[in-house]
Amino acid sequence: MLWRGWAMERILLFFAGYLEGGQPGPEQRDLPICIPVATQLPHAVGLAYAAQYRGDDAVVMAYCGDGATSEGDFHEAMNFAGVWHVPMVFLIQNNQWAISVPLKKQTHSRTIAQKALAYGFPGLQVDGNDLLAVYAATREAVERARRGEGPTLIECVTYRLGVHTTSDDPTKYRSTEEVVEGRDRKSTRLNSSHHTTSRMPSSA
């Protein structure tokens, strides 16, 4: 949000529960933050369709979590995006848990990325802890959309270490061993990504 130009005070207001905090400034090309899960996705497809209709080079990006992919709005948005061939990128943060529901109880699909194939456009899975991998996948998806090749879904696989909300107690539904394993896996990948990035200038 900071990178997109949101003022820090607006972000803090949002997390403090003030309505004003979720409103982007008039100069920003963002929509207000949606609290109901997945409701932003059909709106995003509509914006992408409008951009396509106007003939400009805008690409719409919509973000959601793995839990949102179990909502009807997700599938409706995916269907319209595929049918209309809109310039859009669906970016899914798959952190393995939708509050207290694990991914294996949300879907029988091997990946979330493969769901895109049913709607007629590509889906790919990347390591969500690898900044460079996420950047490369997103850049290619945006360029693809600008070439008129339609939408893309990117599944960023990671792990939620903390609580879902301040009223959440994850110890009631997942083991300490699982959290430790998830933490170690994230640390290893983050360190690997950092070392690769650090070597880039000297190896160029």
Predicted features by range, described:
Residues 1, 64-70, 92-98, 129-132, ...:
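Acidic, glycine-rich active-site loops and adjacent beta-strand->loop/helix elements
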Residues 1-84, 102-108, 113, 118-120:
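Cofactor-binding active-site loop characterized by glycine-rich and histidine/acidic residues
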Residues 144-189, 199:
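Glycine/aspartate-rich loop-and-adjacent alpha/beta segment that forms the canonical ThDP
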